[in-house]
């Protein structure tokens, strides 16, 4: 995930997310390999970013950019529905809030997404310029409605990045396309429950795991194994 930042004391470039769940799983399984999540911090790199972290005293510059863009579009817009959405966004920006926080219906969101307002991207405003990279990652992920799920075993422990409420077959496809293509069931368990068992098999024998179908929305902090056949 690429996160643009302004006015914050953050390092530039790829940064490892220090994931307490991954640390727990590593300690339990002692795998050959650990694959953490890395996010990328881009100073003022709004166009390329998937999310934005910005200091409170810098946010007006971002919002004014969007307001100027709306003003130009309104000066030539003829469609009344387009004008209504743009005017709604402009009024919200005048309250010094990013467009991502504005309540919109699906059609409005689709239009605004295509229009390219920067603050429509998941935007977090921070009072403290010395915020940590991990805190930025967590806050922007929460605003963006994305999450991690995990796979764990002796070979590898890994964090996987997906949209919140991603279904089981989508998570399987993240791991490998063959797992999605031959998906049968996913066996899932919360991180907390897995930590009370010896391993995944032991957790299953204790009734701590759940077998779910491909359409099941996978909760946050879930560890899973995919049953498949290709």
Descriptions of predicted regions:
Residues 1-10, 76-230:
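C-terminal-of-GTPase-core extension/linker across diverse P-loop GTPases
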Residues 1-58, 62:
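Conserved G1/Walker A P-loop phosphate-binding module
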Residues 21-22, 45-47, 57-64, 75, ...:
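Conserved nucleotide-binding/hydrolysis micro-motifs of P-loop NTPases
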């Amino acid at each position: 995930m690429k996160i643009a930042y302004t006015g914050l004391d953050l390092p530039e470039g790829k940064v490892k997310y220090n994931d307490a769940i991954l640390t727990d799983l590593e300690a339990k399984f002692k795998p050959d390999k650990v694959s953490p999540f890395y996010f990328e911090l881009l100073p003022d790199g709004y166009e390329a970013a998937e999310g934005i972290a910005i200091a409170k005293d810098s946010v007006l510059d971002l919002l004014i950019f969007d307001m100027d863009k709306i003003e130009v579009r309104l000066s030539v817009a003829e469609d009344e529905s387009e004008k209504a959405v743009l005017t709604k966004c402009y009024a919200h920006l005048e309250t010094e809030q990013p467009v991502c926080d504005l309540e919109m219906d699906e059609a409005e969101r689709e239009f605004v997404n295509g229009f390219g307002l920067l603050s429509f991207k998941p935007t977090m405003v921070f009072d403290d310029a010395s915020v940590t990279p991990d805190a930025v990652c967590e806050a922007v992920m929460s605003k963006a409605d994305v999450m991690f799920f995990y796979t764990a075993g002796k070979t590898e422990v890994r964090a996987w990045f997906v949209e919140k409420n991603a279904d089981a077959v989508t998570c399987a496809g993240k791991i490998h396309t063959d797992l999605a293509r031959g998906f049968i069931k996913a066996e899932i368990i919360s991180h907390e429950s897995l930590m009370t068992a010896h391993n995944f098999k032991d957790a299953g024998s204790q009734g701590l795991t759940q077998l779910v179908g491909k359409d099941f929305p996978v909760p946050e902090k879930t560890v899973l194994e995919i049953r498949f056949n290709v």
